[in-house]
Amino acid sequence: MTAKVYINGIGAVTAQGIWRPEIFSEAKALQQGISPADYPNYRDLIPGAALRRMSTGVKMGCYAAKQALLAADQETVEAIITGTGLGCSIDSDKFLQQIWANDEQYLTPTAFIQSTHNTVAAQLALLLGCKGYNMTYVNGASSFESACLDALLQLQAGELGQVLLGAVDEIATQTYEFLRLAGRIKPDVFPYAEGACFFSLATQRKASSCAELVDVELCNQLTTADLGLFVSNFLARQGLQTEDMDALMLGYTGNVQDDAYYAALEEILPHAQALQYKPLSGQYDTCSAFGLAAAAYILKQQEVPPVLYRDLQQRQSRPDRWKYLLLYHQYGGKDHTLLLLRVC
């Protein structure tokens, strides 16, 4: 029998501050350009000696992870699984600049060592004393969902009982400029940001449980015409139909190519309430982790914060109970992912 998987704790460092009960009541839409995270006092959760050696992304990740474990009343973890689009890109920039400035000679290895994509997961293992399964996924816009799928499969199969799942990406000046010049990001259209979101997943339900993570699906390429079949097949796997979805968590950005997919999904599920999260999180490779946190919050509280509505003036009648929520993410017409949550 497949085990159920619950989100027992959430932690985050975002442009809206840290994860907290009032995060959505205090949230404001980000402005165009670069939106760095609202950094907390890291010493509240991370020892000072360890903190001094951490880069921005590692600090955000470790803080969010500790926060998620505290929320779940969990002190130890069996496994750590993370996703990141660009890894510790600040240190990557630093190392490449040193190569250029020193004509590829007399380089110290520190920045290179700290720039690897699995640095956050490795630092968490040291911080938490976890000697178990440790994996980092780097798959562009589906990096977090790839990590999520790994965690879900292992928990459902009974290979693990508890997993620390997370995602982190940071803003690096040089990398940001490269992405802008390549047309990958358009800060004049939508804010480019950073953040870390972590989740304590377990097969045991607790009082702190926010929602049940039911299923995850990934597909590299789709047309808007293929989207309906992609979604219906995904739901059918769980014995569900499109009419069973109470809400959609979407990633509108103002980019015509991206938004066409989200608009198409709204047409496929016209009865589901359309919600959005990117005006609060900003755009970065693993921002969908914030969308998952927002979706879990809704199912836990049985209330949709006004700031999450796609169109507050056209919101639909509230269901008797928010039961199923579907999170859909893609970027540039590629890396399409679906995450299904159920109230617990």
Each model region followed by its residue ranges:
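Short catalytic-loop micro-motif centered on adjacent basic/acidic residues
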Residues: N134-V138
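Short-chain dehydrogenase/reductase
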Residues: C148
